[in-house]
């Protein structure tokens, strides 16, 4: 009987130790994730402003406040190994009928190979959502560009004019220069952990973007920058 009691006692101590360990590490991990999330939002603002200032991307400036939403990736890395895998994390914001921009939801983007035309290893990327179909696709599941939704490279150059017909239109630059980044075949998926860290609770993109179940004042500068576009 004593041996059984000893086993139960030891088991209880082990379980309590695990619980206390998890409790002690959960806070720092969540704080780190929140810091990472805010960093992505801040960098997204910088990326957006760089595109808006660049005359070669005047089409972005002229259309961003006319379209349904935008994906902003401050850095998409080309790994250069294992089939040239590439990817990055960014934010998605949608614009409602009143012209108001939503809170950001976090999304990853990955591809076997993006094939940067200028041979760079990293790029800043903006993808405009041209219709409701594009927004709905991001709200419901992971999206494969060129699958159920179409994507096209956006017009580049001072005074560029073009009637692009696609669900998504992408723009990319690397080291301040045009990067003909082909996103066809790449996959965009929700970064659930960062969404939870940024808003303090588990939320779906619909709850963040459409239902406005949470806010974070850290996104105000990014949203203001979007509003300033022509």
Regions found by a protein language model. Give the residues of each.
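Sec/Tat signal peptide C-region and signal peptidase I cleavage site
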Residues: 24-31
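Bacterial N-terminal signal peptides
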Residues: 12-24
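Small-residue-enriched, tightly packed secondary-structure blocks
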Residues: 31-230
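N-terminal secretory signal peptides that target proteins for export/translocation
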Residues: 1-8
């Amino acid at each position: 009987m004593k041996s059984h009691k000893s086993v139960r006692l030891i088991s209880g101590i082990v379980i309590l130790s695990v619980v206390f360990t998890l409790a002690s590490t959960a806070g720092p991990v969540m704080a780190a994730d929140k810091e990472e999330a805010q960093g992505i939002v801040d960098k997204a603002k910088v990326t957006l402003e760089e595109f808006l200032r660049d005359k070669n991307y005047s089409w972005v400036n002229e259309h961003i406040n006319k379209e349904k939403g935008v994906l902003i990736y401050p850095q998409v890395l080309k790994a250069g190994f294992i089939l040239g895998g590439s990817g990055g994390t960014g934010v998605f914001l949608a614009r409602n009928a009143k012209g108001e921009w939503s809170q950001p939801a976090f999304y990853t983007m990955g591809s076997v190979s993006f094939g940067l035309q200028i041979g760079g290893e990293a790029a800043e990327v903006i993808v405009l959502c041209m219709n409701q179909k594009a927004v709905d696709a991001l709200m419901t599941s992971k999206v494969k560009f060129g699958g159920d939704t179409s994507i096209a490279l956006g017009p580049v150059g001072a005074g560029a004019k073009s009637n692009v017909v696609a669900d998504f239109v992408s723009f990319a630059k690397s080291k301040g220069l045009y990067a003909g980044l082909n996103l066809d075949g790449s996959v965009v998926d929700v970064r659930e952990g960062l969404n939870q860290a940024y808003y303090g609770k588990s939320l779906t993109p619909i709850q963040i973007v459409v239902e406005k179940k949470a806010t974070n004042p850290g996104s105000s500068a990014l949203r203001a920058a979007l509003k300033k576009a022509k």
